[in-house]
Amino acid sequence: MNELIAIVGPTAVGKTELAVAWAQRINGEIVSADSRQIYRKMNIGTAKPSATEQALAPHHLIDIRDPEQSFSLAEFQDLALAAIADIQARGHVPLLVGGTGQYLAAVLEGWQIPRVPPQPELRAELEQVALHEGPATLHARLAAVDPVAAARIPPTNVRRVIRALEVYLVSGEPISRLQERQPPPFRPRTIWLHRPRTELYARADARIERMIAAGLVDEVAELLAGGYDWSLPAMSSLGYIQFRPYFEGTADLTTCIERLRFDTHAFIRRQEMWFRRLPNLEIWTPDHPDWRAIIA
C-alpha cells in the first residue's frame, strides 16, 4: 500500500516549517489541508506558506479558488486524493498538511461524501428558518429525518445543519448514511504536532502581530474594494471577519485585533478536539527527537 505522511496540528504549532524541511529530505510534496489557503488574494490572514517556502517544496491545493467561489468538502477530497495519487505515481512522497479537521478526516478516514451540489434557493429558505425561528427549530427538523447526523452536529453549527438537511431533501437519503466510510487507498502515518496550550496561545498572538505588521488590514481593505462581500465563506473566515466592525465604523482597530486573538484561541481548542478523534496518531512535542532532527 502506498505511503502518505499526514502532519496535523492547531494553528501556529509549526506545521509548515516541519513539512517543508521534511519534504526536502524525502523528495516529498505538500498537499495543503487548509480550508482558507485555497483562496487567491488571501495570503496574510490565512498564514499561507510564503513564496520562499513554496519554492523549497512543491505545494498543492493552495491558490485554487477566487474568494467568491464556493468549495465543498467533496471537491477538496477529490482534488486531494488525485494529488496524492499523482505524487505517489511519480515516486514522490505526499505530505498532507493542515489544520482543517473535516478536510483531514475526509482523506484519512475515507469518508464517503454525498455528491449533492449546493442548492442556493433551498439554503436561503433554511437560513430564514434559522433566522426567524431559531437554530433549535432547524436542528429539530434534522433530528426528525436524520437523528444520527443531528447527534453529531450541534444546533449552533447552522451551516452544517443546513447542509445535512439539504442533502436529505435533495437525495432522499440521510447524510449520515451517505457518509459511511471505506479504507483509503494508502497507509497514512499521522503525526499530531502538540504544544502546551499556553505556548500555542503565545505563538498565535505573536503571529497575529506579524500579520498586522505585514499588512493584514490593508489586505482586508483590498478584498472589500475588489467587491468581495462579508457574506462570502472566504470573507467570514478567521482572520478576516473580525475586522468587519472596524470597516463598518462600529469598533476601533485595537478591539478587532483583540477579537482576532480571542477567536484564534477558541479555534485552537476546536482544532485539538478534531485531532483527538483521528486514528493511529503519533504525538510529537517540540522535544521529540525526529521533529528536532528534521528542522535542524
From Swiss-Prot:
Gene Ontology molecular function, alphabetical: ATP binding; tRNA dimethylallyltransferase activity
Regions that span the bilayer: none
Site keyed Interaction with substrate tRNA: positions: 100, 123
Listed cofactors: Mg(2+)
Catalysed reaction equations from the record: adenosine(37) in tRNA + dimethylallyl diphosphate = N(6)-dimethylallyladenosine(37) in tRNA + diphosphate
Region Interaction with substrate tRNA: start-end pairs: 34-37
Record-linked SUPFAM superfamilies: P-loop containing nucleoside triphosphate hydrolases
Keyword Transport: no
Residues the record lists as binding ATP: 9-16
Family: Belongs to the IPP transferase family.
PANTHER family referenced in this protein's UniProt entry, alphabetically: TRNA DIMETHYLALLYLTRANSFERASE
Functional description taken from the UniProt entry: Catalyzes the transfer of a dimethylallyl group onto the adenine at position 37 in tRNAs that read codons beginning with uridine, leading to the formation of N6-(dimethylallyl)adenosine (i(6)A).
Stated name of the protein: tRNA dimethylallyltransferase
